[in-house]
Regions:
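Blade-loop segments of beta-propeller domains
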Residues: 61-101, 105-124
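Loop/turn-rich, solvent-exposed surfaces of beta-rich toroidal or solenoidal domains
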Residues: 211-280
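A short beta-strand motif characteristic of beta-propeller blades
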Residues: 57-73, 108-114, 151-159, 200-209, ...
């Protein structure tokens, strides 16, 4: 993102999920710096944005303060994915409690959410704004019609997919990628906004048998044809154009990797599956948030591998 985004911390007085006009908001101006990082923070069940220079929190969101019915708030426990989307003005998230959600940063409004299965690990935007999510415990890929008028929905189609942990859209090739253990697969999309379906499952490549459990899959920022892929053993880059697979770092069980011109961020778990800070490519801890249980961290920047450079959000279904 080239410009400083002005956002507002919000006090939501009424339910904020059914339309753009049904929330009364008291705004307090806050600046999100150009260099910032978004975190999936499980200790507070929240999404947090921090300043990348000071590592101070500048924005946060949690379901309990966002009009989510009490009985559904458990869906948002243990946030497991955070992706800046729509030119960094929204966050696409999942939580291991079951949620997939789209959040608008400017007023912290929950634009859309749904139950995405047992232990969702990641989600992705499709070209028409619909969503696909992956859940690892019930081993499913699911598509969702993103109805931001109602603000809440259910999955449209479900596909059996063991070891489902990640999902990335490739706008150049019009393909969706996801890993099944050591194997990277692609799907095509039927581009039906009212009936979204994934088609043509195809094996793209297979990691060496020394690897296990493909975890994070994410575009390499400065290489238009390459993807990061973390496993239980190493961190890799795969070039879709040349079919070249390269081992980059010998870090094991990394939950997320994200690079920018300012460096590389990785979540290396130090306690069970989380840590209280991120590390760089040299293994140096960049910051510590006392008491935090961070599961993923990503640079707040445009992802032009997956989305158009100018990617406006459209209200609707």
């Amino acid at each position: 993102m080239k410009n400083i985004i002005f956002v507002f911390l919000s006090v939501i007085l009424f339910l904020c999920c059914s339309s753009d006009n049904d929330a009364i908001i008291i705004n307090e101006p806050v600046k999100i710096p150009e260099r910032s990082i978004v975190l999936a923070e499980q200790a507070t069940k929240s999404i947090v944005i921090i300043d990348a220079d000071t590592y101070q929190k500048v924005w946060s969101w949690d379901a309990a303060k966002s009009g989510v019915p009490t009985e559904r708030q458990i869906w948002f426990s243990n946030p497991s994915e955070v992706k800046p989307v729509y030119n960094g003005k929204y966050i696409l998230m999942t939580a291991s409690g079951g949620a997939v959600a789209l959040i608008r940063i400017v007023d912290s409004k929950l634009m859309y959410y749904a139950q995405a299965g047992s232990n969702p690990h990641s989600a992705e935007l499709l070209p028409d704004g619909n969503i696909v999510a992956v859940s690892s415990t019930d081993t499913k890929l699911r598509t969702f019609v993103t109805d931001t008028i109602k603000g809440f929905g259910k999955f449209y189609a479900s596909y059996e997919f063991p070891s489902a942990h990640n999902v990335v859209w490739d706008k150049k090739r019009n393909l969706l990628y996801t890993t099944q253990d050591r194997k990277l697969y692609s799907f095509t999309y039927n581009n039906d906004s009212k009936a979204p379906q994934l088609l043509d499952k195809t094996l793209v490549m297979e990691l060496p048998n020394t690897e296990s459990c493909g975890h994070d899959l994410f575009p390499v920022q400065d290489k238009e044809n390459s993807l990061w892929l973390t496993t239980n053993e190493n961190i890799w880059q795969y070039n879709l154009e040349t079919n070249k697979l390269e081992k980059i770092y010998p870090f094991y069980a990394v939950k997320s990797v994200s690079d920018s011109k300012d460096g590389i961020l990785m979540l290396y778990p130090t306690t069970q599956w989380w840590s209280d800070g991120l590390i760089n490519e040299k293994g140096k801890k960049l910051f510590t948030i006392p008491g935090a249980k961070i599961y993923k961290g990503r640079w707040m920047q445009d992802n032009t591998f997956s989305y158009p450079e100018n990617h406006p959000f459209k209200l609707g279904k």
